[in-house]
Amino acid sequence: MPIHEVKHPLIRHKLGLMRRADISTKNFRELAQEVGALLTYEATKDFNLQEKTIEGWAGPVSVEQIHGKKVTIVPILRAGLGMLDGVLSLIPVARVSVVGQIRNEDTLEAETYLEKLVGELDQRMALIIDPMLATGGSMISTIDLLKKAGSTEIRALVLVAAPEGVEKVLEKHPDVSIYTASVDERLNEKGYILPGLGDAGDKIFGTKQKDV
């Protein structure tokens, strides 16, 4: 199933806190990291394990370790940085690629202004992270870049998604799996998610939030 709406009680509770209009930058930032980590847990539960014998405190012991999986985390700037530490807390050896996307507020189309990708993308699973999947433009553009650079296995972690954006992404890239805390109701006329979280980038970085 390409869309996974993760309804774990901890995720639902934390997402509810994030929806508050009066939430502080500190609390929003911390919750974005926490929910990002919980989504990572769900998105990686099919990783293969291999048994290995190590030296334990009382002698040799058989353990299981993740085998054969290289990962690159791909935050979409700038808001995706707000989830990065949470994902890295669970996959600390992952390489980080960076894609900068900005939305043209007149056309609602995504424009790429930065692309810094790690090597060997054909040998890595790419985890795209972005708090909001709204119109889908930034996500589609980022997936296009990754595939052009050699990526063959791509998953996306988003805190909140709009059904319109999900539909567009999966129409263009049906092989990409999306993990989200919530598929919300719809987009408003300005392309923002309702009920959504407001402008996640502004809330993470403490900048002035636009009228959404």
Swiss-Prot record:
Gene3D superfamilies: 3.40.50.2020. InterPro entries: PRibTrfase_dom, PRTase-like, Upp_B, UPRTase/APRTase, Ura_phspho_trans. It comes from the Bacteria. Allosterically activated by GTP. GO terms for molecular function: GTP binding; magnesium ion binding; uracil phosphoribosyltransferase activity. The keyword Transport does not apply. Its cofactor is Mg(2+). Uracil binds at residues 193, 198-200. Its EC number is 2.4.2.9. Pfam families: UPRTase. GO terms for biological process: UMP salvage; uracil salvage. Keywords: Allosteric enzyme, Glycosyltransferase, GTP-binding, Magnesium, Nucleotide-binding, Transferase. Binds 1 Mg(2+) ion per subunit. The magnesium is bound as Mg-PRPP. 5-phospho-alpha-D-ribose 1-diphosphate binds at residues 78, 103, 130-138, 199. Pathway: Pyrimidine metabolism; UMP biosynthesis via salvage pathway; UMP from uracil: step 1/1. It catalyses: UMP + diphosphate = 5-phospho-alpha-D-ribose 1-diphosphate + uracil. Belongs to the UPRTase family. Catalyzes the conversion of uracil and 5-phospho-alpha-D-ribose 1-diphosphate (PRPP) to UMP and diphosphate. NCBIfam families: PRK00129.1 (NF001097), upp (TIGR01091). This is Uracil phosphoribosyltransferase.
